[in-house]
Amino acid sequence: MVKTRFAPSPTGYLHIGGVRTALFSWLYAKQKKGEFTLRIEDTDLERSTQESVQAILDGMAWLGLDYDKGPIYQTERFDRYKAVIQDLMDRGLAYYCYASPEELDEMREAQKARGDKPRYDGRYRDFDGTPPEGVKPVIRFKNPEDGEVVIDDLVKGRIVVANKELDDLVIARSDGTPTYNLTVVVDDWDMEMTHVIRGDDHINNTPRQINLYKALGAEPPKFAHIPMVLGEDGSRLSKRHGAVSVLQYKEDGFLPEALLNYLVRLGWSYKDQEIFTIQEMIDLFQLESVNASPSTFNLEKLLWINQQHIQMTDIDNLVKNLKPFMDQKGIDTEKGPELSHVANLLRERAKTLIEMADSAAYFYQDFTEFEAGAAKKHLRPVAEEPLRLVQKKFAELTEWKADKIHEAVHQAAEDLEIGMGKVGMPLRVAITGGGQSPSIDATAELIGQQKCVARIDLALQAIEARKANS
């Protein structure tokens, strides 16, 4: 059975790069009918926070990236790691290193001065003398000195590293806590991971980790190192590019499936298809098709994909995601048309759920002022006669339906022998308060007959006031 995992460190937010790694691992497991595990790598006790753990859990839940096992916390497995470290020590495959931080700094500076690659020189590898006083040792793994490590990476291809290029890895800190490189190997071994999908910033650790697997008598998993996500300027993605917490995208009005659709396209493609449902991603995703080159984050593209998903998603899902934004704005959706009808009308134009909620306000809330620009352009004295006639026709309608409303507006334009725009635009401003809305007849139908007649009254008052001030 295929087994994958997502193993974030709770030392900050769950960001775009991390989510893409989680998504690729989740998709691969789903497609292969395998098992996906969430593991929290919280061994860095100084930097790990409960707030970050919660942000990871909340982000995964919002995105719908469900896991078959977990969350598993590394801090609950310290006894296991210590037993493995002791086993390596007992078998002569690990050793105490007493080099002080100052000693290591001097070593690296001397190597740089000689033009060598800075690395630990193995000075305590075969040490059997008296340990220096006052130094708490770390424990290092004895990396093989001969031979080479071959990685057949599913994304990067074959990578060959000579063991003489690798120094001896620290597997336990001076306080006895295990390091990332030890815990990740033990966890993936114990949890029988078949595929490790992670960012290519981990690729330098992989040869050392493979040697650790071999020392433990374990079969290494298959590796797939996916390239990082860059900002539009070509530098590593950071907060200024939008590498904020994934939950920020929720707050900014993105649908979770739109964000996943955008992320799956960062480094992977299927023919020339841009828009994918979750099921299509599961069916079509191929790990071997992931591009080995970095991808560029583009907010405009994300907005476009979000717009497509707003248009195509199931109306119940749209309403479920839109409702919190309506509540945030203090819009009581019980006092007005059904939110599903409003959402259906607004979904064609909105790029985000925030835009949608802003546009929906006039369906539920009356207003006393009009958008200044729209009023200046369309609520002019010349609009008074068309508005009065439309108001009269609206008041006389016995059936308040979009087609009847359309007929009334059309008839008013014909009666006055003017173009539809000279009736429609002032009417749009009158009943919505601004210059943009979906079709005026469908909008008016949802707002309601009485409200439309009353709002036209307000617009006529604004025109009167304008005439008085001119």
UniProtKB/Swiss-Prot annotation:
Locus of motif 'KMSKS' region: 236-240
Keyword Ligase: yes
Motif ('HIGH' region): 8-18
CDD domains for this protein: GluRS_core
Any single biological process term in GO: glutamyl-tRNA aminoacylation
Catalytic reactions of this protein: tRNA(Glu) + L-glutamate + ATP = L-glutamyl-tRNA(Glu) + AMP + diphosphate
Location within or outside the cell: Cytoplasm
Primary residence: cytoplasm
The enzyme's E.C. designation: 6.1.1.17
Residue sites binding ATP per the record: 239
UniProtKB keywords: Aminoacyl-tRNA synthetase, ATP-binding, Cytoplasm, Ligase, Nucleotide-binding, Protein biosynthesis
GO cellular component: cytosol
Superkingdom as given in the UniProt entry: Bacteria
Molecular function GO terms recorded: ATP binding; glutamate-tRNA ligase activity; tRNA binding; zinc ion binding
Biological role: Catalyzes the attachment of glutamate to tRNA(Glu) in a two-step reaction: glutamate is first activated by ATP to form Glu-AMP and then transferred to the acceptor end of tRNA(Glu).
Family per similarity comment: Belongs to the class-I aminoacyl-tRNA synthetase family. Glutamate--tRNA ligase type 1 subfamily.
Subunit structure: Monomer.
Name the UniProt record assigns to this protein: Glutamate--tRNA ligase
Native source organism of the sequence: Hydrogenovibrio crunogenus (strain DSM 25203 / XCL-2) (Thiomicrospira crunogena)
Name of the coding gene: gltX
